[in-house]
Amino acid sequence: MGSGYQLLQLPRERFRKTSFLVWVIILFQRAISMPLGIVTNSTLKATEIDQLVCRDKLSSTSQLKSVGLNLEGNGIATDVPSATKRWGFRSGVPPKVVSYEAGEWAENCYNLEIKKSDGSECLPLPPDGVRGFPRCRYVHKVQGTGPCPGDLAFHKNGAFFLYDRLASTVIYRGTTFAEGVVAFLILSEPKKHFWKATPAHEPVNTTDDSTSYYMTLTLSYEMSNFGGNESNTLFKVDNHTYVQLDRPHTPQFLVQLNETLRRNNRLSNSTGRLTWTLDPKIEPDVGEWAFWETKKNFSQQLHGENLHFQILSTHTNNSSDQSPAGTVQGKISYHPPANNSELVPTDSPPVVSVLTAGRTEEMSTQGLTNGETITGFTANPMTTTIAPSPTMTSEVDNNVPSEQPNNTASIEDSPPSASNETIYHSEMDPIQGSNNSAQSPQTKTTPAPTTSPMTQDPQETANSSKPGTSPGSAAGPSQPGLTINTVSKVADSLSPTRKQKRSVRQNTANKCNPDLYYWTAVDEGAAVGLAWIPYFGPAAEGIYIEGVMHNQNGLICGLRQLANETTQALQLFLRATTELRTYSLLNRKAIDFLLQRWGGTCRILGPSCCIEPHDWTKNITDEINQIKHDFIDNPLPDHGDDLNLWTGWRQWIPAGIGIIGVIIAIIALLCICKILC
């Protein structure tokens, strides 16, 4: 009996041990999640209490960042003549500086060095710690003179001048800046790599590296009467060749124009000054603001082969040899091709493919290093693969005095053919002065290329100079032709990667940038969510009498047109919810600051202080992407096709898998209980 009793008691002992272990686990779990009453150390900070009480819940505002947003995202004119009209001088207004944590990548930045008529400087030097804006695609460097009627240069529309994580109300001399405002956005947490130390002067300007994907290109200008009602702006091709800018234009136009002048050998000689003017028929608004990508509408693209260079007049100067030999004025006219419809593919209406001889991003910056201006281009012998178009002609005034540079060129017309042809540009000799013999004309054989002029480095030039080889083919499959996608993708606009290709809407009348790329002191990434707070700028304090706060309407251009008309209602709903979430975080941050003396909000309220305003941005964004994917990218499914994996009898596969999983879990639980008991 005794042995039988012990055998009967053995399972009960095991059960007691198992029960004891379970109770220990339960008590240990409750001890970890004990209410705030056990925290008696009054020296704890609010953030530490939040970590004890709220743990994984959203209780901090670390994701709320002050971001410098560029005004160019709203589609404002970025050319130098238009931009300088937004700046003015004032006296008696002290400058103000505001710091921000993250900045947006800028397409156009500016760098000014202006002097008065007496030689004194118009702009002050930057204070200690103020560095230039580090993320610029084009830097417009302006040198010139002006009356400068005031002490400091402010923004007439009440915006900031954005520098490296500092936004100032004034322009500093020789320091690169971008126009913008400061707003609050909910940004993703930066990626922290334990093996990578943070440099002392972050963000590192990646444009210093010539191999970087983002590479800065400097455009030089000369301006007179800066700050006055009527200013004169000249685009500087080299030290003696300029182009008169009399209407708005894009930086892509200036890059193409520079290369066209150099390839056609239309530069001034070493002692003369040549100023070109643009014919009214030329459209300088080629290309569209597409953020780091030179996306051009083919019908608006500038074709250097259709440009006509004509010398208008020559004014000689009978001074010493050290002075300029003469000032030459020329006119650039444009005869557009008759029809380019044969170059547009008909199989894919939403996509227009344009082949260019080189990489998409680096077509205008090949062979350049950071800090090198557009005037540093050289006329190297090169080969360009072109598509057929109407034959080109060149008109040059024959009544040109001998003092002017000999820029004539004879061209042999050849009929267009169905296949691509290759042009061999002979090396251009330096232009001779007025006392030297005339330069012999060079001969070109071309059917009028349709690709834009571009600059290549010597290595690519050597590879492309082989007969039958085009630069585009030499670049390999990793360097495809330029493609314009007219369907905007919401996925790209909400969570893009750093080097991801962009898409542009077909009807971008205001040239609005639909994406938001930002840089921080630690990492770069994409903005998470659409939460934003109305920006603040210096004009909010009423210190300006010129201009109005018109930047407020469409601050981010309707949040940069993140979706098309079919998802507009969903976008507005998302914006409203994220705004409420942002304001809640701001209020919580203010309350934490006020109650920090008594230990913080959680010390007073206990666990009820844990707020968790969920961010459903990704879910709503996925729905938007799914809508666009269903109705644009994919055709409607055929419900009659029983071969679909999730139709017919196959629709029971997920249910069967779930049932089998439940059965396996029950069997495993029974086995565990059998072993323990």
Curated annotation (Swiss-Prot):
Glycan attachment points: 41, 205, 229, 239, 258, 269, 297, 317-318, 339, 406, 420, 435, 463, 564, 619
Residue ranges crossing the lipid bilayer per the database entry: 652-672
Extracellular-side positions: 34-651
Keyword set, alphabetical order: Clathrin-mediated endocytosis of virus by host, Cleavage on pair of basic residues, Coiled coil, Disulfide bond, Fusion of virus membrane with host endosomal membrane, Fusion of virus membrane with host membrane, Glycoprotein, Host cell membrane, Host membrane, Host-virus interaction, Inhibition of host innate immune response by virus, Inhibition of host tetherin by virus, Lipoprotein, Membrane, Palmitate, Secreted, Signal, Transmembrane, Transmembrane helix, Viral attachment to host cell, Viral attachment to host entry receptor, Viral envelope protein, Viral immunoevasion, Viral penetration into host cytoplasm, Virion, Virus endocytosis by host, Virus entry into host cell
GO annotation terms (biological process): clathrin-dependent endocytosis of virus by host cell; entry receptor-mediated virion attachment to host cell; fusion of virus membrane with host endosome membrane; symbiont-mediated suppression of host innate immune response; symbiont-mediated-mediated suppression of host tetherin activity
GO CC, any one term: extracellular region
Cytoplasmic compartment spans: 673-677
Modification note: The signal peptide region modulates GP's high mannose glycosylation, thereby determining the efficiency of the interactions with DC-SIGN(R). N-glycosylated.
Coiled coil regions in record: 555-596, 616-635
Disulphide connectivity of cysteines: C54-C610, C109-C136, C122-C148, C512-C557, C602-C609
Site positions for Cleavage: R502, S503, D638, H639
Lipidation residue positions, type S-palmitoyl cysteine: C671, C673
Stretches for region Disordered: 315-349, 361-484
Signal peptide span: 1-33
Ranges for region Mucin-like region: 306-486
Annotated stretches, region: Fusion peptide: 525-540
Homology family: Belongs to the filoviruses glycoprotein family.
Additional remarks: Filoviruses entry requires functional lipid rafts at the host cell surface.
Protein name (database record): Envelope glycoprotein
Source taxonomy: Viruses, Riboviria, Orthornavirae, Negarnaviricota, Haploviricotina
Gene designation per UniProt: GP
